[in-house]
């Protein structure tokens, strides 16, 4: 079940980003210290009263080259397409403006729940000024102050009340769910169509449990698959095609519902920052990952080209050192037959559970070979390790003091675990806990 999506919409300078940061809170500042993981605050996770959701800050989208009305229209279009609930932000100090009414006209047509929030109501005396906003036609306005954090609780209560009811996935546990993600025009649709063109593939399109998604179910060599596709691959909106940042929004829902994510790169264009950003979301979500370099037929090659590309990918995607790389051509179908076996392999690894005795032997040998360094006269002591989860495989290491588990030593233990067990294609998590 994908998390609900909330979009913050409003004309420029009403405080959208301030409210976004208030709602997201400290999560924005959590940055993994790994080269290549690029953070973009346009999209983040948040929680209210135990319910997690994703939130889009349309104010983080740079449309400065577009005319003013086009900026507003584009922001509203994102919200209408992507969100389950829309927060419409206005400025209480300025009253209802023509631009607010323009936004309202677009939002009327969305048929989405809309919570109207009046920002910059910084003291109780200003509450009398909110009544004009009833004229926008969205019911009770919620007075808030993004800068002081006032009124956000009532607003979020209203947002949470509009979340769609949770639905269980309707697919058997042994079905492998995967998605293709990447920038526009990297060839995701072409790869999908080439895969579905195989004789042994049985295709049926059914509506997915997630709004605006189409799940393609099919069977290949006796294994059932679900290709999770957001509308972005099938419905090409002008705004989405023209601005690469929007492809991240399209990818997020697919990532959340997938077991395996194929990150598609265009060989003709090379590696772009947006490729790394999208891949970073899949990594952070803990999904199994395959890097697929498409349009391999379209570039000049010699016997060294694959090695040069592989080294470049490993350098630029250091956080995906575990992900296998496949060089394919959707046009000629070169190496496409490798994808299904690889999807199966990384899916199996993603859900692999290892024996505790073997795991602890591996950790003991690792510590004996390379004890942790001293820190302020103290040394990390590992008592035992246990696997607490799969998808992704997650290991808790019980220690004398978690503060002594440095990032570099955590990475060392992860590498020893990878050497001992088949975890190709899947991230693994190593968490230090104090033994009680």
Swiss-Prot record:
InterPro entries, A to Z: G_ENGA, GTP-bd, GTPase_Der, KH_dom-like, KH_dom-like_a/b, P-loop_NTPase, Small_GTP-bd
Transmembrane parts of this sequence: none
Residues of the KH-like domain: 352-436
Pfam families to which the protein is assigned, alphabetical: KH_dom-like (PF14714), MMR_HSR1 (PF01926)
An example Gene Ontology molecular-function term: GTP binding
Origin superkingdom: Bacteria
Function of the molecule: GTPase that plays an essential role in the late steps of ribosome biogenesis.
Protein name: GTPase Der
């Amino acid at each position: 079940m994908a998390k609900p999506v909330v979009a913050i919409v409003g004309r420029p300078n009403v405080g959208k980003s301030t409210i976004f940061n208030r709602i997201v809170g400290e999560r924005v500042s959590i940055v993994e210290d790994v080269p290549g993981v690029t953070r973009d605050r346009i999209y983040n996770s948040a929680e209210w009263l135990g319910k997690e959701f994703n939130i889009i800050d349309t104010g983080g989208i740079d449309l400065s080259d577009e005319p003013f009305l086009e900026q507003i229209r584009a922001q509203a279009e994102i919200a209408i397409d992507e969100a389950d609930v829309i927060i419409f932000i206005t400025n209480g100090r300025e009253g209802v403006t023509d631009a607010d009414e323009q936004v309202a006209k677009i939002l009327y047509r969305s048929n989405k729940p809309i919570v109207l929030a009046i920002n910059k109501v910084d003291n109780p005396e200003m509450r009398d000024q909110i009544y004009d906003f009833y004229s926008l036609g969205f019911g009770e306005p919620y007075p808030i102050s993004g800068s002081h954090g006032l009124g956000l609780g009532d607003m979020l209560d209203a947002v949470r009340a509009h979340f769609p009811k949770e639905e269980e996935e309707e697919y058997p546990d042994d079905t492998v769910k995967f998605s293709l993600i990447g920038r526009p025009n990297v060839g995701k649709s072409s790869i999908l169509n080439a895969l579905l063109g195989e004789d042994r593939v049985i295709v049926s399109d059914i509506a997915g449990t997630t709004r605006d998604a189409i799940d393609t179910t099919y069977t290949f060599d006796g294994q059932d698959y679900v290709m999770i596709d957001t509308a972005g691959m099938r419905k090409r909106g002008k705004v989405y095609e023209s601005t690469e940042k929007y492809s991240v929004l399209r990818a997020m829902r697919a990532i959340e519902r997938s077991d395996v994510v194929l990150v598609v790169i265009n060989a003709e264009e090379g590696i772009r920052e947006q490729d790394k950003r999208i891949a970073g979301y899949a990594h952070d979500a803990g999904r199994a990952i395959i890097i697929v370099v498409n349009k391999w037929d379209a570039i000049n090659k010699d016997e060294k080209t694959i090695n040069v590309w592989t080294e470049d990918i490993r350098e630029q995607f250091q956080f995906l050192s575990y992900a296998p790389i496949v060089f394919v051509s959707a046009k000629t179908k070169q190496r496409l037959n490798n994808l299904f076996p690889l999807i199966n392999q990384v899916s199996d690894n993603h859900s692999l559970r290892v024996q505790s005795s073997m795991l602890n032997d591996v950790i003991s040998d690792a510590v004996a070979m390379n004890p942790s360094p001293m820190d302020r006269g103290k040394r990390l002591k590992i008592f035992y390790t246990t696997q607490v989860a799969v998808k992704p495989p997650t290991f808790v290491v019980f220690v004398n003091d978690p503060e002594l588990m440095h990032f570099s030593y955590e990475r060392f233990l992860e590498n020893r675990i990878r050497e001992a067990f088949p975890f190709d294609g899947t991230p693994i998590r190593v968490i230090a806990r104090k033994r009680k």
